[in-house]
Regions:
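Conserved GNAT acetyl-CoA-binding A-motif
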Residues: 117-127
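Conserved active-site alpha-helix within GNAT-family acetyltransferase domains
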Residues: 106, 110, 118, 130-149, ...
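Conserved beta-strand in the GNAT
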Residues: 62, 68-76
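A short beta-loop-alpha structural element at the N-terminal edge
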Residues: 11-23
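A short, internal acetyl-CoA/4′-phosphopantetheine-binding micro-motif in the GNAT/acyltransferase core
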Residues: 93-100
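A short helix-loop-beta-strand connector motif used in the catalytic cores of GNAT acetyltransferases and
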Residues: 50-62
């Protein structure tokens, strides 16, 4: 299907183990877009364990256009002490380049918002790179507030091990 062809159906469904390869492919595409491909150490096996292992740590949705996998959203629950409620955190939302501008990202976000409301979450939140103005503008158009005073703090790899042993 070319970008010019119209899409007759767009369906959102929970990911299944058979989708892991599709999701990993899109994770790599997203990393290239975000100029972070050097950071991807994920494998199909590790993703499968995270999504479908004995104790899953995340969930995923798949977006299909006319039966073709064209998008995914990966999310998990966090917790707000201020609200004393769980929240829904969107780790990734990705729509393949050829399928952008068709409203699929909009539909995926709305679907996730419904999940958050159904699960009585106090928040639905995610991060966005500060240079990704198309995404920032899209999220603002959906009602998201971009929090200017917050920064992500991350400890991983050797610094994480050192901190744990300190």
């Amino acid at each position: 299907m070319t970008a010019e062809q119209s899409v007759n159906t767009f369906a959102i469904r929970p990911a299944t183990p058979a989708d892991v390869t599709h999701i990993m492919s899109m994770i790599r595409e997203l990393a290239v877009f975000e100029k972070l491909e050097h950071m991807v150490v994920a494998t199909d096996a590790l993703l499968h364990e995270g999504l479908f292992g004995e104790r899953p740590s995340c969930e995923a949705l798949i977006g299909e256009a006319d039966g073709e996998v064209v998008s995914y959203a990966l999310y998990f629950h966090n917790f707000s002490t201020f609200l004393t409620k769980k929240g829904l955190y969107l780790e990734d939302l990705y729509v393949r380049q050829a399928h952008r501008g068709k409203g699929f990202g909009n539909r995926m976000l709305k679907h996730l918002a419904r999940i958050a409301v159904e699960r009585q979450c106090g928040r639905f939140e995610w991060s966005v790179l500060d240079w990704n103005m198309p995404a920032i503008n899209f999220y603002k158009s959906m009602g998201a507030e971009i929090l200017p005073d917050w920064r992500i703090c991350r400890v991983s790899g050797e610094p994480l091990t050192a901190l744990a042993q300190a």
